[in-house]
Curated annotation (Swiss-Prot):
Seems to be associated with itself or another lens membrane component via disulfide bonds. The modification Phosphothreonine is found at T171. This is Lens fiber membrane intrinsic protein. The keyword Nucleotidyltransferase does not apply. It is found in: Membrane. It comes from Bos taurus (Bovine). Belongs to the PMP-22/EMP/MP20 family.
Length: 173
């Protein structure tokens, strides 16, 4: 059980760090604008070496930002629950700590999937036509890696929960 929780905690730490970095950085998309290199993130866009805040309130940016922040918060609370799961005495007999941590990591995975799906859909259908020479960049890719890490953290914690439940049910009362 503890090896699964340890693996889950490792994946969770890596996934949460990647979520925060992906959300905060400005390299979701790279393109050429009037022959100059440009890139944009969720909060700023940069032309050459000069960066500007994205002041427009565009729905897909707001949705992507909100879901990335929700994903980071779920992953952080999952880490806290995952650390507490190492404690021996459960405070609630009906609520398993590894199960709760696993659910939080799956919620984080769901939110980052929503954020990346929205961003991908709008970028490919609208911005891809606007900018001829463009590509997704490393911040966007970190978001997908974070999705995998939070998903595997949830899997590890669910495996730890199942092992604990099987042991609990097999011991005589």
């Amino acid at each position: 059980m503890y090896s699964f929780m340890g693996g889950g905690l490792f994946c969770a730490w890596v996934g949460t760090i990647l979520l925060v970095v992906a959300t905060a950085t400005d390299h979701w998309m790279q393109y050429r604008l009037s022959g100059a290199f440009a890139h944009q993130g969720l909060w700023r866009y940069c032309l050459g070496t000069k960066c500007y805040l994205q002041t427009e309130s565009i729905a897909y940016w707001n949705a992507t930002r909100a879901f990335m922040i929700l994903s980071s918060l779920c992953a952080t609370s999952g880490i806290i629950m995952g650390i507490v799961a190492f404690a021996q005495q459960p405070t609630f007999t009906r609520l398993s700590r590894p199960f709760s941590a696993g659910i939080m990591f799956f919620a984080s995975t769901f939110f980052v999937l929503l954020a990346l799906a929205i961003y991908t859909g709008v970028t490919v259908s609208f911005l891809g036509r606007r900018f001829g020479d463009w590509r997704f960049s490393w911040s966007y890719i970190l978001g997908w890696v974070a999705l995998l890490m939070t998903f595997f953290a949830g899997i590890f914690y669910m495996c730890a929960y199942r092992m604990h439940e099987c042991r609990r049910l097999s011991t005589p009362r």
